[in-house]
A protein has these predicted regions:
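Rossmann-like NAD(P)(H) cofactor-binding subdomain of soluble oxidoreductases
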Residues: 1-2, 14-16, 20-21, 25-30, ...
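NAD(P)-dependent Rossmann-like dehydrogenase/reductase catalytic/cofactor-binding core
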Residues: 176-179, 183-245
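Rossmann-fold NAD(P)-dependent oxidoreductase module
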Residues: 2-7, 163
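Glycine-rich beta-strand-to-loop/alpha-helix junction loops that act as flexible
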Residues: 51, 147-150, 204
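A short glycine-threonine-serine/GTX helix/turn-capping micro-motif
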Residues: 142-151, 198
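Internal alpha-helical scaffold of NAD(P)-dependent oxidoreductase catalytic cores
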Residues: 83-91, 106-142, 152-191, 234, ...
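A generic structural motif
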Residues: 8-13, 129
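A general structural signal for well-ordered alpha-helical segments in protein cores
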Residues: 23, 43, 55, 81, ...
Length: 245
């Protein structure tokens, strides 16, 4: 929402939310009116940001209010476009953004059920960051590595802060240093392989190599794979649970 507001001040938003606390939070942050019931939607884009478990109830209650010219945009993990098509005949686009789009510099993987750029929505999305279309069968792994991706890096950062604190730095200093480290990383990332960048940073028998050797001896690759695999399997499981409802 913040990214879209930054992108075009002339966009019109109609927000619907059941939870009173969330409604108040939106009103305070964006100064928007928020309704708890959907009006008849004749045109435009309906962005679904609800919990997957609430999807059936949402469409059972509201599908007759969503007219055929409305583009349905979903960001729900594990929910396939084919499942939504059971309720409505509308064009559907599925996205897997992450929080970086609020600053209009994100990356948005998408898949859609139609060919053209309906309502110029892809053009609008490109203002939030780069966009790339994928086969929907890849969305489980995309959800795991990109949708959940920021959490992996921030969890690692949190553990580094804890370790630095145990080794003598104050928590505030540790947080400051890691924050500066994270801000510097984009300048290192380009067309080069990550492994090549690591090689450029480390030196023989140096501190970086010592740390990497420790990670390898503790099966860091297995730890990372298990985490990504667990997230991927959870996305698959969510999809199965929804399809069986």
């Amino acid at each position: 929402l913040k990214g879209l507001i930054n992108l075009d001040k002339n966009l019109t938003f109609h927000l619907y939310e059941k939870e009173p606390k969330v409604m108040e939070s939106i009103k305070e942050e964006f100064n928007f009116d928020v309704k708890n019931e959907i009006d008849v939607i004749e045109s435009g884009i309906l962005l679904l940001c609800i919990k997957p478990k609430d999807l059936n109830k949402f469409f059972d209650t509201n599908k007759d209010k969503i007219l055929k010219d409305v583009l349905i945009c979903t960001v729900l993990a594990g929910v396939e476009t084919a499942y939504i098509s059971k309720f409505v005949e509308n064009k559907i686009i599925r996205l897997m953004p992450n929080l970086s789009i609020k600053n209009n510099n994100g990356f948005i993987p998408y898949t859609k059920t139609y060919q053209e750029d309906y309502l110029s929505f892809l053009e609008l999305l490109s203002g939030l960051g780069s966009i790339t279309e994928y086969e929907e069968e890849l969305f489980h792994i995309i959800t795991a590595i990109y949708g959940s991706g920021p959490a992996w890096y921030l969890e690692l950062s949190s553990r580094i802060v804890e370790s630095a604190t145990k080794l003598g730095l104050s928590k505030s200093e540790s947080n400051k240093i890691i924050n500066e480290l994270l801000k510097s990383l984009p300048s290192l990332v380009g067309g080069d392989e990550f492994s090549n960048i690591v090689e450029k940073i480390k030196s023989p028998k140096g501190t970086t190599e010592a740390g990497i050797n420790s990670l390898n001896s503790d099966s860091f690759d297995k730890i990372v794979f298990n985490a990504i695999n667990a997230a991927t399997e959870r996305s698959i499981q969510i999809s199965k649970e929804i399809n069986n409802e």
